[in-house]
Amino acid sequence: MKFSIMGDSISTYEGYNPFLYDVFYTEERAIQAGLRSVNDTWWMKVINSFGGELCMNDSYSGSYVAGATSASAHSVERVSKLKSEESLPDIVLVCMGANDCGGGITLHGEDADDEYAFDTTYGIMLDRIKAMLPEAKIYCATVMLTDDEASGKYKFRLDYIEKYNEIIRQVTKDHGCALIEMFDKHIGYTTIDGLHPDRAGHQAIADMIIAGMKRSMLSD
């Protein structure tokens, strides 16, 4: 089973993302976060738990779903990186939305092609993934809270996150994809700066995604 990841900085790791992508978890930051190897990242923990292998990690630090740039998750350029030259993924994990929330991206577009609104671009992203990878199972994760003790410049308001999560839930349902519910007022992940998970934080994210995927598989 081959996995591809559509993510932002939380899902990056030096040496595992496409050439010229911005990466948050450089060797120095990985050490700061307590990540001993790529196997301590949330996404590799998920892949390993299902006995799978990585196809592509299409994660770009600082990227939004919305926006008219090649780094935007809904762009043709980003979506095209979900497959490799040799293979296609069986599963695509979409873990996007934190930067849109933090950046205050407009929630609802004026029309279906609005590249600057979260709801329209999340839908465009899923349309393009499904068109390119019609056989892949697509899982979309809502934005998870950080631990109550987390602090730093990236701390988000709970009520604000939920506005974006509501869009993720609805658009995921409308496009026939599987939802992984990550939002729980009583569960958060630990960080190094208020947003980016440390080793324990990566484990917490992985646990939520693994549980969500298993629930979805049982209901299929």
Label every model-predicted segment.
Residues 10-11, 201:
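Short active-site segment of divalent metal-dependent hydrolases/proteases
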Residues 2, 16-120, 196:
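Conserved SGNH/GDSL esterase-like catalytic core that processes O-acyl groups on lipids
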Residues 10, 61-64, 145, 186:
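Residue-level detector of flexible, active-site-proximal loop/helix-junction positions
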Residues 8-9, 98:
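Active-site metal-binding loops of divalent metal-dependent hydrolases
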Residues 6-7, 141:
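Short hydrophobic segments within beta-strands
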Residues 3, 9-10:
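Short glycine/proline- and aromatic-enriched beta-strand/turn motifs that initiate or cap beta-hairpins
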Residues 74-220:
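Alpha-helical cap/lid subdomain in secreted, periplasmic
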